[in-house]
């Protein structure tokens, strides 16, 4: 029997498809209905930007704030030094403290687009777990915190078990990650009254550890809520495209390319993505998702515009749509295409088409370039390129050269 929550937040989570599991739905619903509930999601600083795979949880924090509660973004300045082993086949490379700080700053820019930070009761709060983890005394930590954890139970978590079943090494460093993340929840409850941790369903074991620890040490009534691990209808992991990670920082992925990622959504995913990644009413999302044939393209454009507006602003979304129209309908260049700077010295007296594409970073290898040409998938300034060995010179590039790879990838190459 489906539980029907009375709190606005849980109702939104349920209606829009954010909810995978909850440790105690009715008790959490009661807490959310009777006052402001601080809730957090943790983010390790493993890259200079968040990517589309993080966006679902960011939207959960945004809805939390919109429904009258306090979102906490916890930066993993401490835990990033250890690395989360959850469902990974190998240990993460360790980052320097300076690199971690740089990554946190890049992530901060993204959160500021979705959440309102400040000192008010429902204003978002950003914390860094290095504040308390860097100060821990190891022996005290083992005595006061470590004694509450069962190694047998930790080994039973699917995130660890799957790694051990494949006979892949799990370092003691990584094993400690679960204890440190659990300690984060305890520390946040102590410092801010945080009562809810959210995350992807792969974090269930870590979340439950934190709840158990906090109940044992501080007897706090706290909760966990997870979202589904999202894949596209054709089985691809959310956050990746053929060209790599879909970054949320505009410096790492142009707003046009971000817009195009959403415009390329498969028909079967449109309704679901509208509910998860926009704030359009659920009924409208369902109506748009049910469109068929050419009509669904209008829904995809709306999806791309709404998601891009939230991240980059309305002007960027409108510019991206105008560029797409120029590229696909009018054969033009469009002012918002990403520019690739190629040193003139690299081009020299000329390169073959295949070597030019590799040098500009547009394909990974000469073999890929030749396949692209053989399949009639390459155009220069809207003209088909039929010979992978044809010369490309400074005269070919001119002031700028529009390179089209397939129907949906377009770049401007300029000599520097």
UniProtKB/Swiss-Prot annotation:
A motif ('KMSKS' region) lies at residues 237-241. One of its GO terms (biological process) is tyrosyl-tRNA aminoacylation. GO terms for molecular function: ATP binding; RNA binding; tyrosine-tRNA ligase activity. Keywords: Aminoacyl-tRNA synthetase, ATP-binding, Cytoplasm, Ligase, Nucleotide-binding, Protein biosynthesis, RNA-binding. Its EC number is 6.1.1.1. Residues 351-416 form the S4 RNA-binding domain. Pfam families: tRNA-synt_1b. A motif ('HIGH' region) lies at residues 45-54. Homodimer. Catalyzes the attachment of tyrosine to tRNA(Tyr) in a two-step reaction: tyrosine is first activated by ATP to form Tyr-AMP and then transferred to the acceptor end of tRNA(Tyr). This is Tyrosine--tRNA ligase. It comes from Cereibacter sphaeroides (strain ATCC 17029 / ATH 2.4.9).
């Amino acid at each position: 029997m489906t539980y029907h929550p009375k709190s606005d937040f849980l109702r939104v989570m349920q209606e829009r498809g954010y909810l995978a599991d909850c440790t105690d739905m009715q008790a959490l619903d009661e807490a959310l209905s009777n006052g402001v509930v601080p809730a957090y999601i943790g983010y390790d600083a493993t890259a200079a930007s968040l990517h589309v795979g993080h966006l679902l949880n960011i939207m959960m924090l945004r809805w939390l704030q919109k429904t009258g509660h306090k979102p906490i973004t916890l930066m993993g300045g401490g835990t990033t030094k250890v690395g989360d082993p959850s469902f990974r086949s190998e240990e993460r490379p360790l980052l320097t403290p300076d690199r971690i700080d740089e990554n946190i700053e890049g992530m901060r820019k993204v959160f500021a687009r979705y959440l309102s930070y400040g000192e008010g009761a429902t204003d978002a709060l950003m914390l860094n777990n290095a504040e308390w983890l860097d100060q821990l005394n190891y022996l005290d930590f083992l005595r006061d915190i470590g004694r509450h954890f069962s190694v047998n139970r930790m080994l039973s978590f699917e995130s660890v078990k799957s790694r051990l079943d494949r006979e892949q090494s799990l370092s003691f460093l990584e094993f400690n990650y679960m204890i440190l993340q659990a300690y984060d929840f305890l520390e946040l409850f102590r410092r801010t009254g945080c009562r809810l941790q959210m995350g992807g369903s792969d974090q269930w074991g870590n979340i439950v550890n934190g709840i158990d620890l906090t109940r044992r040490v501080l007897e706090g009534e706290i909760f966990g809520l997870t979202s589904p691990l999202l894949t596209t209808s054709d089985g691809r992991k959310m956050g990746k495209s053929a060209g790599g990670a879909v970054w949320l920082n505009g410096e790492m992925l142009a707003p046009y390319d971000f817009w195009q990622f959403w415009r390329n959504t498969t028909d079967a995913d449109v309704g679901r993505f509208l509910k998860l990644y926009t704030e359009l009413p659920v009924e409208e999302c369902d109506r748009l998702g049910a469109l068929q044939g050419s009509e669904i393209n209008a829904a995809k454009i709306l999806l791309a515009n709404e998601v891009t507006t939230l991240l980059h602003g309305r002007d960027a979304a409108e510019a991206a749509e105008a560029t797409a129209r120029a590229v696909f309908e009018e054969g033009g260049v469009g002012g918002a295409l990403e520019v690739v700077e190629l040193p003139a010295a690299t081009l020299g007296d000329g390169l073959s088409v295949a070597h030019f594409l590799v040098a500009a970073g547009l394909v990974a290898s000469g073999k890929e370039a030749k396949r692209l040409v053989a399949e009639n998938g390459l155009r220069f300034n809207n003209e088909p390129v039929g010979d992978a060995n044809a010369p490309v010179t400074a005269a070919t590039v001119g002031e700028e050269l529009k390179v089209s790879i397939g129907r949906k990838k377009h770049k401007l190459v300029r000599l520097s």
